[in-house]
Amino acid sequence: MAAKDVKFGNDARVKMLRGVNVLADAVKVTLGPKGRNVVLDKSFGAPTITKDGVSVAREIELEDKFENMGAQMVKEVASKANDAAGDGTTTATVLAQSIITEGLKAVAAGMNPMDLKRGIDKAVAAAVEELKALSVPCSDSKAIAQVGTISANSDETVGKLIAEAMDKVGKEGVITVEDGTGLQDELDVVEGMQFDRGYLSPYFINKPETGAVELDSPFILLADKKISNIRELLPVLEAVAKAGKPLLIIAEDVEGEALATLVVNTMRGIVKVAAVKAPGFGDRRKAMLQDIATLTAGTVISEEIGMELEKATLEDLGQAKRVVINKDTTTIIDGVGEEVAIQGRVTQIRQQIEEATSDYDREKLQERVAKLAGGVAVIKVGAATEVEMKEKKARVEDALHATRAAVEEGVVAGGGVALIRVASKITELKGQNEDQNVGIKVALRAMEAPLRQIVLNCGEEPSVVANTVKSGDGNYGYNAATEEYGNMIDMGILDPTKVTRSALQYAASVAGLMITTECMVTDLPKADAPDLGGAGGMGG
């Protein structure tokens, strides 16, 4: 086992604080509407330019191992805030730096670290309750656009696009961010349920100009099996032909004789048919077939429940207003399923999301909810160069996370004002002893740090602005973009409650651990092995 380097007490804390400051100082220059960019070198390709706190934090590794431990612990704050709310990473870092700096000063002055931590935790718990009380629900499109705009660093077009996407696919809908092809940002919305399976034969195409199959008011046959024998399909085909409507077959697979017969029928115009494979694999395929059945008021023909394809009737078939199939995707628009049944199915899937243990499962279940509840929107980010594209895409993703958080837990006044109001409401809070009271004061002072940093990044005097904001009440604050005072909510400067809450909780959690650190252990650097000496008589 390698020998260790051990540092105690003040020696350890000073080193740790130095690492915290290096990382936090690099991250906090990005805070606020007038925050600056940070350029990150890459081992290959062009450097990345970003204003995203967590991206900056992830890049920082320090040479001194003790300093690096301090930096890595603050990096954890940014990562946790990012995972929980998708935004607020810079705010969390600024809060953590302030709590650690003030807390370590108090420890150096002889306070008990454990009592300090208890005081900080008490203040943060009270602050979180006050934040919830200040929170206003965020439901209308205008508020969503404002949250998106603030989170995308005052880029109004991004805020509007996100609000429009949420309008179209609902709060539950899936919104994804992709690279665009032009200079402008675009929004593509797929209404209805879309899954990534295309037609099984190009002979089904009835719209050659678009290379797609379009079926109006079709019957939809859902089968959880491979279909290779046409005899199984004949009764359904005859019934559908009599009804004079097209038919879409969604099955595990349609092959051989069955597929050939369907193609011949379509080409001769006897009955309009198209066949696609069911989406997903294994149990997920069964679940998705059931989703489609709920959406179209059909029944999945499955041998597991004793149903045979030959005995299927028109009552077992689902229906939709329209189906569009191309090479890679199938979209079912306006299924005739009952709203109550669809909501029931959505509730059932939500329950599974609660119980899901892996992120992958959770994501797939969320997609299924979206497909049942609304649709899918794709924001295509436009930019002139690849470097700008990466930077902008990161901002749009941040803004999207922020708006989701706002819809979930509501919004509070932005620009660091909410934390100042919360701090003013809990100034009377008392701990069990004097050291805990100092811990409470440390947390209250930290709650001013985000506002001070936003003002500092504008080139103004933080103390003057902080005192002016403190002298007001409610949503009165400082608009750093226009350098005016006023009602933050009226000016459209909103922060999602979840983002502010997560930033405060994670910052206090990690800062509390660092304040109570008394010893740090790391590997001693290995001495380089001496070079092999030249062999005798071989000198130059």
Curated annotation (Swiss-Prot):
What InterPro entries does the annotation carry? Answer: Chaperonin_Cpn60_CS (IPR018370), Cpn60/GroEL (IPR001844), Cpn60/GroEL/TCP-1 (IPR002423), GroEL-like_apical_dom_sf (IPR027409), GROEL-like_equatorial_sf (IPR027413), TCP-1-like_intermed_sf (IPR027410)
Task: Name the residues that bind ATP.
Answer: 30-33, 51, 87-91, 415, 479-481, 495
Which cysteines pair up through disulfides? They are none
Under Pfam families, the record lists: Cpn60_TCP1
This entry's Enzyme Commission designation comes to 5.6.1.7
Keyword Cytoplasm present in the record's keywords: the answer is yes
Q: Which SUPFAM superfamilies match?
A: GroEL apical domain-like, GroEL equatorial domain-like, GroEL-intermediate domain like
GO-annotated biological processes = protein refolding
- PROSITE patterns from the entry? CHAPERONINS_CPN60 (PS00296)
One annotated Gene Ontology cellular component of this protein: cytoplasm
Q: Where in the cell is it found?
A: Cytoplasm
Q: What quaternary structure, including any partners, is listed in this protein's UniProt entry?
A: Forms a cylinder of 14 subunits composed of two heptameric rings stacked back-to-back. Interacts with the co-chaperonin GroES.
The name this protein goes by in its record: Chaperonin GroEL
- Which species is this record about? Pluralibacter gergoviae
